[in-house]
């Protein structure tokens, strides 16, 4: 049935085990390392002083659920599979694990992180650089749409960590500009998304070029069967860290829907909302690039300052737009799912799904941004007759109830 979550997409330990049993048969018992320690504070994790300084300077106070369980096993050099949604602090989990283990006197690539999109790779590069600020870490993002020669120059001058998209990273390995000899940590972020974008072969090709003894981390919001296959091929007795299904609520985010009889009436509904609410910063999601342009024109025509990004724009333009949005000079960003995972703006208090996503999984990536690390956020979904089924699927998929938008919505923001 169209619109329903694909089987095995929401991470469920029982389902995962059943799938692994199917793949591994009787070896399954020996496959995982059990690790149950939970660390309530960053100070208790035994991290280097300068890494802690970076963590606190970045604004983290208390570790999130995934950080409490995930940082230490990674620091110990264990293979880890971690399942957590966007906005839970998983990027900082593997960044901390990598930064703790680097040999800073050796200016060679020691850690390789793969991500599905340029935006996400650049986001990870930023977090890594900020957390490693007091350690003097050298990080570089190798992504498509940028100068190959510039990549080669930076890699040859020496870096500790490379973050990138599979295509460009493989290219750099093939050209021998990125030398794999000292790489000891390999992380796949948003593994589900990389696989669904058809990067499987490239990931396998990259893995073949890495040293045989390597620590592997797989991070994924969902776990489709292909991700399990990677787990089995690449990993050695991984520690499995689940933020359990009931913790995978979209905690701290109030979710509402607005019934809109006709598609044409969404614009009026949107403008009414902006007139009644004092919104600091908001992101509006639509499903097509053309609609991004259309809605941007309509909003500007009504004197709203809005920014827009989508996949047809070149990288440079997108970077400039995201910078404006982050700095607050533009308060509204209109975009598509493609960029949902690369948006990390701490002040976003409202996400509007002008169009509901076409798959339930993407709902989490969109609205996970409005409630980062315990900040309260609000998401409002515009629902036409045709969307009712998808709204139902989303509620079922995440086990949430999305209520009709109350009249006093202004008090919630």
Curated annotation (Swiss-Prot):
GO BP: any one term: cytoplasmic translational initiation
Q: What is its EC number?
A: 3.6.4.13
Q: Give the superkingdom in one word.
A: Eukaryota
* Name of the protein described by the UniProt record: Eukaryotic initiation factor 4A-11
Reaction(s) this enzyme catalyzes, per UniProt:
ATP + H2O = ADP + phosphate + H(+)
The record's comment on protein family reads:
Belongs to the DEAD box helicase family. eIF4A subfamily.
Keyword GTP-binding assigned to the entry: answer is no
InterPro entries from the UniProt entry: DEAD/DEAH_box_helicase_dom (IPR011545), Helicase_ATP-bd (IPR014001), Helicase_C-like (IPR001650), P-loop_NTPase (IPR027417), RNA-helicase_DEAD-box_CS (IPR000629), RNA_helicase_DEAD_Q_motif (IPR014014)
Q: Where does the chain bind ATP?
A: 84-91
Its annotated function is as follows: ATP-dependent RNA helicase which is a subunit of the eIF4F complex involved in cap recognition and is required for mRNA binding to ribosome. In the current model of translation initiation, eIF4A unwinds RNA secondary structures in the 5'-UTR of mRNAs which is necessary to allow efficient binding of the small ribosomal subunit, and subsequent scanning for the initiator codon.
GO CC, sorted alphabetically, is: cytoplasmic stress granule
The keyword RNA-binding appears for this protein: yes
- Signal peptide boundaries: none
Residue intervals of the Helicase ATP-binding domain: 71-241
| UniProt motif (Q motif) ranges | 40-68
Q: Which UniProt keywords apply?
A: ATP-binding, Helicase, Hydrolase, Initiation factor, Nucleotide-binding, Protein biosynthesis, RNA-binding
- Per its UniProt record, what SUPFAM superfamilies does this chain match? P-loop containing nucleoside triphosphate hydrolases
Tell me the enzyme class. hydrolase
The record's note on quaternary structure and interaction partners says: eIF4F is a multi-subunit complex, the composition of which varies with external and internal environmental conditions. It is composed of at least EIF4A, EIF4E and EIF4G.
Q: Where is the Helicase C-terminal domain?
A: 252-413
Where does motif DEAD box map?
A: 189-192
The molecular function terms in GO held by this entry are: ATP binding; ATP hydrolysis activity; RNA binding; RNA helicase activity; translation initiation factor activity
Species annotation: Nicotiana tabacum
């Amino acid at each position: 049935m169209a619109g329903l979550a694909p089987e095995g997409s929401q991470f469920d330990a029982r389902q995962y085990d059943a799938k692994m049993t199917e793949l591994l048969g009787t070896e399954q018992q020996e496959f995982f390392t059990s690790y149950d320690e939970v660390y309530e504070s960053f100070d208790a994790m035994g991290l280097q002083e300068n890494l802690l300084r970076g963590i606190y300077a970045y604004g983290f106070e208390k570790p999130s659920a995934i950080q409490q369980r995930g940082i230490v096993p990674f620091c110990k050099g264990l293979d880890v599979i971690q399942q957590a949604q966007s906005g839970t602090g998983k990027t900082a989990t593997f960044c901390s694990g990598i930064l703790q283990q680097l040999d800073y006197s050796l200016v060679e690539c020691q850690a390789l992180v793969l991500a599905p999109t340029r935006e996400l790779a650049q986001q990870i590069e930023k977090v890594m650089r900020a957390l490693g600020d007091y350690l003097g870490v050298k990080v570089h993002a190798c992504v498509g749409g940028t100068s190959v020669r510039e990549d080669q120059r930076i890699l040859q001058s020496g870096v500790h960590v490379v973050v990138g998209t599979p295509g460009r990273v493989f290219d750099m390995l093939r050209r021998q500009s990125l030398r794999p000899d000292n790489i000891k940590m390999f992380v796949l972020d948003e593994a589900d998304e990389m696989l669904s974008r058809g990067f499987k072969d490239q990931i396998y090709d990259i893995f073949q070029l890495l040293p045989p003894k390597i620590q592997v981390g797989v991070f994924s919001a969902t776990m489709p069967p292909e991700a399990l296959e990677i787990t089995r091929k690449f990993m050695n007795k991984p520690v499995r860290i689940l933020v359990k299904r009931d913790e995978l609520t979209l905690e701290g985010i109030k979710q509402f829907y607005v019934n809109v009889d006709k598609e044409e009436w969404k614009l009026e509904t949107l403008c009414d909302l902006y007139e009644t609410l004092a919104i600091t910063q908001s992101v509006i999601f639509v499903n097509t690039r053309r609609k991004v342009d259309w809605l941007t024109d309509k909003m500007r025509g009504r004197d709203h300052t809005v920014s827009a990004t989508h996949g047809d724009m070149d990288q440079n333009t997108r970077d400039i737009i995201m910078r404006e949005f982050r700095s607050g000079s533009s308060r509204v960003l209109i975009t598509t799912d493609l960029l949902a995972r690369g948006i990390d703006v701490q002040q976003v208090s409202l996400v509007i799904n002008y169009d509901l996503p076409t798959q339930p999984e993407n709902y989490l990536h969109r609205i996970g941004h409005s409630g980062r690390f315990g900040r309260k956020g609000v998401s409002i979904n515009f629902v036409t007759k045709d969307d009712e089924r998808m709204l139902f699927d989303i509620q079922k998929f995440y086990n949430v109830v999305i209520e009709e938008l109350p009249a006093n919505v202004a008090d919630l923001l």
